[in-house]
């Protein structure tokens, strides 16, 4: 994603460790990044975001997320994390500085989870007016949470249609399309003649979000 303040392309993601061609269970995980300089047309070697508590954030990464860049150049980077002993993920938004070269931790907001499956993970963030919205993956359903400052969020609620029925998304990330004509959610769901597709991950759907409800 283009970082306007620095004039650099900042790619963010997470590390994944393998052994014998398989992902290592209960592995260390970090948010990773690399920077592209359009003047030299080169990428930097990838680096990782240093977090304040290596035990608490033993498995912490910005995998499959959408971040938000602020006018002052700071970055709101959603991550999900757990310690080695925990079974469920928590989601938080990390405020980072970025000087065009190094991504550095400043602070993080409240920590969101639910007692269902692996918790809340693969978060994506957007802003609409004076509110920030965070969409979250869970094993059973998609969730959304709202904030006034981009760091501290209300209790997550399940994604619902305007008639109160469940969206039908589960165990798959969702993403935002923030447009001048409104806010939209890109998602997958069951119940669309797609039972033959793994976790109903095709086709992709897009729906307008009512930010008031």
Describe the residue ranges of each PLM region:
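Beta-rich carbohydrate-recognition and catalytic domains
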Residues: 1-60, 68-122, 126-168, 180-182, ...
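Alpha-helical scaffolding within the catalytic cores
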Residues: 170-174
């Amino acid at each position: 994603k283009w970082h306007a303040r620095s004039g650099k392309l900042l790619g963010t993601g997470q590390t994944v460790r393998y052994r014998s061609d398989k992902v290592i269970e209960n592995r260390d995980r970090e948010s990773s990044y690399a920077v592209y300089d359009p003047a030299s047309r080169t990428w930097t070697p990838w680096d990782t975001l240093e977090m304040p508590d290596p035990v608490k954030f033993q498995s912490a990464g910005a995998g499959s997320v959408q971040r938000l860049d602020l006018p002052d150049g700071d970055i709101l980077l959603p991550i999900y994390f757990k310690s080695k002993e925990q079974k469920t993920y928590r989601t938080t938004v990390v405020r980072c500085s970025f000087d065009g070269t190094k991504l550095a931790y400043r602070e993080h907001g409240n920590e969101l989870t639910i007692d269902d499956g692996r918790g809340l993970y693969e978060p994506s963030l957007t802003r609409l007016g004076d509110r920030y919205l965070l969409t979250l993956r869970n094993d059973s359903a998609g969730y959304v949470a709202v904030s006034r400052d981009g760091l501290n969020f209300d209790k997550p609620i399940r994604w619902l249609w305007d008639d109160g029925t469940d969206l039908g998304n589960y165990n798959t990330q969702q993403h935002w399309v923030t447009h001048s004509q409104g806010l939209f959610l890109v998602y997958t769901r069951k119940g669309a003649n797609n039972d033959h597709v793994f976790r109903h991950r095709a086709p992709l759907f897009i729906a307008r979000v009512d930010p008031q409800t």
